[in-house]
Every structure is written in structure tokens, then in C-alpha cells.
């Protein structure tokens, strides 16, 4: 069974890190790199609907084109990850679901 770190390395072979913008937060952002993965959900953006779908399907990993924690887009919101704010609420759900 592949682990998150192996999937990340395979993705970097297809899309090398150095092709990303310097402000783009690429790579594994949350959870254990050693987690085994049976199911992956691929999405353009990590939204509440995407997280719900990943939970419903029993996914251990979401691979998205746009990073959930993008410093350029979410700089102010990342300073406090509160569950009453959008980004904090999504991250809390992902951590609880071990995705």
C-alpha cells in the first residue's frame, strides 16, 4: 500500500516543485507523510463539499491543484485557524477525519 510521501514524490516527478510560483504552497500540507493511502480524491480546490465527498468515500488523501493553505490568498486567515472561520473549519474537519 502506498504512503502519502510516496504519492507526493510521484506527483513531484510529474510536476516538479521548481515549476511552482515562489509564493505557491506546494506539497504535503497536513497529516502524516507515513499514512497509508487506499483512496485519493482529486480536486481543483479544497472546499467543504470536497471534504464531505472525501469523508463519504473514505479517502485518506486529497490532491488539489490549488493548495488549501496558500499564503498569498489566505495570509490573514492563516494567522488564527479558528473553527468559526472557513479555513480553520476545513482544516479541523481534515484533521478529525485523518485525511
Kindly give the residue locations of the regions a language model identified.
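Active-site catalytic microenvironments in core metabolic enzymes, especially phosphate/sugar-handling
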Residues: 1-99
Amino acid at each position: 500500500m502506498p504512503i502519502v510521501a510516496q504519492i507526493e514524490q510521484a506527483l513531484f516527478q510529474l510536476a516538479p516543485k521548481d515549476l511552482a510560483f515562489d509564493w505557491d504552497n506546494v506539497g504535503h500540507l497536513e497529516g502524516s507523510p507515513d499514512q497509508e493511502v487506499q483512496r485519493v480524491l482529486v480536486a481543483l480546490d479544497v472546499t467543504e463539499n470536497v471534504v464531505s465527498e472525501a469523508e463519504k468515500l473514505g479517502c485518506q488523501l486529497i490532491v488539489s491543484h490549488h493548495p488549501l493553505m496558500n499564503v498569498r490568498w489566505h495570509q490573514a486567515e492563516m494567522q488564527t485557524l479558528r473553527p468559526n472561520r472557513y479555513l480553520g473549519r476545513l482544516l479541523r474537519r481534515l484533521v478529525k477525519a485523518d485525511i
